[in-house]
């Protein structure tokens, strides 16, 4: 029997499932309104997410979106029912929704690239944790180094460090 050598090879089949994320961003303060995840995105799922984020009376005036086929008649009808004006961008023009493109890059660089996602539920948890960090703690130069949800200046005291996403990010506060 031959001993293993560098010329020996081994193979193992594997598959990778994709999990899709949905981020909805409010432009005025760059606040993430919604973060969702699914393994099987459909027009019905997108419509349900829009209803969850907008409710029936809290809807924004416009939805700026790309021209993906998933935004079909079902989503268009839901936007009409929520009284949201649909504003698809021009074909192959991602710069027309630059704030969201920047957000997706931040989520990838600051979060998902450093976490092994174990499934749809886990990705949803990771995105919601990052959304809380992004909205309440992470500073933005365009907001004069404030967070999307403004916070009061804290009184003098001992500084406490709270880990976020298992220590990937930290929030500092005074007690």
Task: List each language-model region with its residue ranges.
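Charged DNA-binding/catalytic regions of mobile-element recombinases
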Residues: 1-175
